[in-house]
Regions:
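Type III/flagellar secretion export determinants
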Residues: 1-162
Length: 162
């Protein structure tokens, strides 16, 4: 099934223009867009099938990052592994840039500590940004570790706290 079936010439042109703009900008492609490529541009389809799979793999690795620093390392490492002679080099670079940009906008990224050192300290101390509790009166209470940290003026990065 060709997704452009039943479209006017103008609608087809818009669909195709939008599709190739998405490819150039590294955006995710819909099932209809992939189907169109499979039927009408098999070379680009093969490239984009690979790009979409590798983009998903990068997104998955980014979600496992324990710090913003680690997320950046994952992204730069993925980009550095793109071969100069890869026929999908341009599309992969755009997809990785887009995936990393989208991840940086996410709540998950905003809640990550800045460095791996901070992430390890939080893990070691058992503190997390969501460990605040409310007592019966509605007052915010710190967990024991956070209270000690607060008392000694070594406050953690609580940016983005909900």
């Amino acid at each position: 099934f060709d997704p452009t079936t039943g479209m006017s010439d103008e609608e087809k042109k818009k669909f195709i223009d939008k599709l190739y703009k998405k490819i150039k900008s590294g955006k995710k492609l819909s099932a209809d867009e992939m189907q169109y490529l499979r039927m009408n541009d098999p070379v680009t389809y093969a490239k984009m099938a690979k790009v979409q799979i590798q983009r998903k793999a990068l997104e998955s690795r980014l979600k496992q990052a324990k710090s913003k620093e680690e997320a950046l390392e994952i992204y730069t490492s993925a980009k550095s592994r793109i071969s100069d002679d890869d026929p999908a080099r341009e599309e992969l670079n755009a997809a990785y840039d887009d995936a990393y940009g989208e991840f940086k906008k996410s709540e998950q990224y905003k809640k990550l500590p800045a460095t791996e050192k901070e992430a390890k300290e939080k893990e070691k101390n058992g503190t997390s940004r969501s460990s605040w509790n409310k007592d019966i009166t509605g007052d915010t209470k710190f967990t024991e570790n956070e209270e000690e940290t607060y008392e000694f003026g070594i406050s953690g990065d609580f940016e983005g706290e909900e």
